[in-house]
A protein has these predicted regions:
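Gly/Gly-Pro- and Ser/Thr-rich, intrinsically disordered tail segments characteristic of DNA damage-repair
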Residues: 1-117, 125-126, 276, 288-293
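Catalytic cores of large soluble enzymes that bind and process phosphate-bearing ligands
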Residues: 2, 6, 140, 199
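A structural signal for alpha-helix termini and helix-coil/disorder junctions
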Residues: 13-16, 20, 48, 140, ...
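Basic, nucleic-acid-binding surfaces and adjacent catalytic neighborhoods in DNA/RNA-processing proteins
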Residues: 24-42, 55, 147, 151-293
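Phosphate/anion-contacting hairpin/loop surfaces
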Residues: 71-171, 176-183, 191
Length: 293
């Protein structure tokens, strides 16, 4: 699933192209992608409207329209936006097509069909149920660190699980949570309540640094994330532990390990991140060969 850097990369690509263009026509070929209104209502709300600009809330992409309506899109697992000069370029799984006044087409493609589109009044954006669940992300200028610290330090869950909870801090996802915990040398299985405030501060600072760098390199493409004209994110070249199972740790020269916790893969260095002998005895290391697709 695209995480914050990948979503921001998509926005950075689309914004200069679609902003100030008017949506002349809309075609929807997969009704279930439209969530809180009917397909006809969706088309009525966005057709003939100028796209003012795009922004982001967590992993949600916000298309702000001139009629004070915001189209809220989520890529989910495999969603992608493409810009076509003509519809001869269409490919399988192109499900929503926006014809733009500049002669181009903004196309939403989704092989898994898990993507979502909501329509909401811009003034009521924060009342949309899906967005109300989304906490601030570490790159927001007014990020409420005290709130995040309070929720982490009272939690009985592992810090890795906590960082994936979008209601506590948004945008990290599995890749960047693994990288942040390695950067801070924190054991991913440590319960939130067992961390110190200094460790939480370190997590916050590392999150900002890693997310910012990942955006600079257009996110991480491991399997299928692409943007623009099939461009790939290059932050994969800077990953320290994620997707590095059985490879050598750049710090201590021991091997990176991979195992499951609550259904999500943890990548970590058992030495640098101080996994205990008891923890290592309980986990089942995943015998998976890491392969880029």
């Amino acid at each position: 699933m695209p995480e914050l850097p990948e979503v921001q990369t998509v926005i950075n690509y689309l914004n200069p192209i679609v902003s100030n263009q008017t949506i002349l026509d809309v075609q929807v070929y997969k009704d279930k992608l439209i969530k809180n209104v009917t397909v006809n209502q969706f088309i009525e709300q966005v057709k003939a409207q100028k796209i003012l600009n795009l922004s982001r809330k967590g992993k949600y992409i916000l298309f702000h329209l001139a009629n004070q309506i915001t189209m809220v899109a989520h890529l989910r697992m495999e969603g992608k936006f493409f810009i076509y000069d003509n519809l001869k370029l269409m490919r399988n799984h192109d499900y929503i097509i926006f014809k733009l006044s500049g002669g181009q087409f903004l196309v939403f493609n989704d092989t898994r069909q898990f993507g979502t589109f909501h329509i909401v009044k811009t003034s009521e954006l924060n009342d949309l149920k899906e967005l109300k669940k989304v906490a601030q992300d570490p790159l927001e200028a007014n990020f409420n660190f005290d709130r995040m610290a309070h929720l982490i330090l009272k939690s009985n869950k592992s810090i890795k699980t906590i960082l994936l909870d979008q209601s506590i801090v948004s945008g990290l996802g599995n890749i960047y949570a693994n990288e942040v915990l390695f950067a801070t040398r924190i054991n991913p299985l440590t319960k939130g309540k067992d961390l110190t405030i200094d460790q939480v501060k370190a997590i916050f600072q590392a999150s900002k640094k890693i997310l910012t760098k990942a955006i600079k390199y257009n996110g991480t493409t491991i399997h299928s994330f692409k943007f623009g004209n099939n461009q790939r994110g290059s932050f994969l070249d800077f990953l320290k532990v994620h997707f590095k199972a059985k490879q050598i740790c750049s710090i201590c020269l021991n091997h990176i390990i991979r195992f499951k916790d609550h259904g999500r893969s943890i990548y970590c260095c058992p030495v640098c991140q101080n996994l205990t002998a008891e923890q290592l005895a309980k986990i089942n290391l995943e015998e998976v060969e890491e392969t880029k697709l």
